[in-house]
Amino acid sequence: RGLGDVYKRQDQIGRDVFSRLLYAIRISLLVGILATVISTVIGVVLGLIAGYFGGVADMLLMRFTDMVMSFPYILLVLVAAAIFKPGLWSIILILGFVDWPGVARLVRGNVLSLRETNFVKGNVVAGMPLRHILFSEILPNTVAPILVYATSVMAISMLDEAALSFLGMGVQPPMASLGNMLNGAQSITVLTSQPWLWLPPGIMIVVLVVSINFVGDALRDAFDPSGGRR
């Protein structure tokens, strides 16, 4: 049997490789989506506050954002993963609370320009509630860049989960993830004689990340057609 029969293959302890691969893909997507939602919500809230109010609030929030971004990203993730108990929900929360600074800076930049527009000033003069101005007037006009940026955050989160699980600091066995499936294929014997243990999860990591980046490119072109033309 060749590699094409991966759906019939088993690992060293008799677990079906194809079933575990399908489950691992679901875990990777779950981590990517939930971590992106958490980081996006945090970044949007902080970016709205910093951009709209300015002054001391802007200075404090942006200095805190700069401080978080000044740490090497992968080192920050590794330290957080080492502190907390490894597991699915731990890695989702860690990635969600580490990936928000980019979203916050993006939203703040958009809010700084939008708050000077006539339709926002008109709402302020009309005495509209702050909640309405932020979430009904300003936020909808920042959705497009947020969605585009969120796709890159999702791809990075999935890569980070795979890396941490490979190192034994992410999703723990017996739960399958693409990273810990690769973790079980480190010996030369497995690499050379049992490629069905490591090649399918490796390929799926590449396919998922590239596909999400393609979605991000398509969203960018859809929201800004003129910007995508050469």
Please report, for each region that a protein language model flagged, where it lies by residue.
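Short, small-residue-biased leader/transition segments that mark boundaries at the very start
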Residues: R1-Y7
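Alpha-helical transmembrane segments of integral membrane proteins
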Residues: Q10-R230
